[in-house]
């Protein structure tokens, strides 16, 4: 059975968030097209993730080195590892997220920090880091109200680019993508822009 992890990195309702609307559209179509797959949903805004602080980082480093952890270090390391284990157990992963303030929501950044562990998602070699999860199939559903694919704001796009770089670090270099942009910058075209993205999400979900 194929294990599929759906990750939602936006706490707004679908009627107020294009990335959440894409998530729900993709999820509905995927379940219809792949009825035998095991689907798990992870809402990062409901998960109440503790930030990747010095104590968590210390605990993970000590654990990797075989050293003794304090009770708080162990508690936090266990939380990070539980999310990493869930990610590693998935054959396919769908990530839906917006561009907020040129980047990703803090909850999503924290989650990606949990995943970024040497020996698990990547390893160090004499020639630099090498990803360890290249076999994962990933779909990225991203929405940004402005225009960032080209023009004067292109260099400000640190949402999709950041996530793609993190995944490439893990060995996942060619994720599937649905990108909706410009619906706030061009309100007269918003309905058509969002509709086109929704159709793209449906078609990708069918074959993902």
From Swiss-Prot:
The keyword Hydrolase does not apply. GO terms for molecular function: electron transfer activity; FMN binding; oxidoreductase activity, acting on NAD(P)H as acceptor; oxidoreductase activity, acting on NAD(P)H, quinone or similar compound as acceptor. Binds 1 FMN per subunit. Gene3D superfamilies: 3.40.50.360. FMN binds at residues 17-19. Keywords: Flavoprotein, FMN, NAD, Oxidoreductase. Transmembrane segments: none annotated. Its EC number is 1.6.5.-, 1.7.1.17. Pfam families: Flavodoxin_2. InterPro entries: Flavodoxin_fold, Flavoprotein-like_sf, FMN-dep_NADH:Q_OxRdtase_AzoR1, NADH:quinone_OxRdtase_FMN_depd. It catalyses: 2 a quinone + NADH + H(+) = 2 a 1,4-benzosemiquinone + NAD(+); N,N-dimethyl-1,4-phenylenediamine + anthranilate + 2 NAD(+) = 2-(4-dimethylaminophenyl)diazenylbenzoate + 2 NADH + 2 H(+). The keyword NAD applies. Quinone reductase that provides resistance to thiol-specific stress caused by electrophilic quinones. NCBIfam families: PRK13556.1 (NF010075). Belongs to the azoreductase type 1 family. This is FMN-dependent NADH:quinone oxidoreductase 1.
């Amino acid at each position: 059975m194929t294990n599929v992890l759906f990750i939602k990195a936006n706490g707004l309702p679908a009627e107020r968030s294009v990335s959440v609307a894409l998530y729900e559209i993709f999820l509905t179509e995927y379940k219809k097209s792949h009825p035998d797959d095991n689907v798990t949903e992870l809402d990062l805004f409901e998960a109440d993730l503790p930030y990747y602080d010095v104590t968590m980082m210390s605990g993970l480093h000590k654990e990797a080195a075989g050293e003794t952890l304090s009770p708080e270090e162990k508690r936090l390391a266990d939380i990070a590892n539980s999310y990493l284990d869930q990610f590693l157990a998935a054959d396919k992963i769908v990530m839906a997220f917006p561009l907020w303030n040129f980047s990703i929501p803090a909850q999503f950044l924290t989650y990606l920090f949990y995943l970024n562990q040497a020996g698990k998602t990547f390893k160090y070699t004499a020639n630099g880091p090498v990803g360890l999860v290249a076999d994962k199939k990933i779909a990225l559903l991203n929405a940004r109200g402005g225009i960032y694919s080209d023009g004067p704001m292109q260099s400000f796009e640190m949402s999709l680019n950041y996530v793609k770089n993190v995944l490439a670090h893990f060995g996942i270099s060619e994720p599937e993508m649905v990108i909706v942009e410009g619906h706030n910058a061009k309100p007269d075209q918003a309905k058509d822009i969002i509709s086109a993205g929704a159709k793209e999400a449906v078609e990708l979900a069918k074959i993902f």
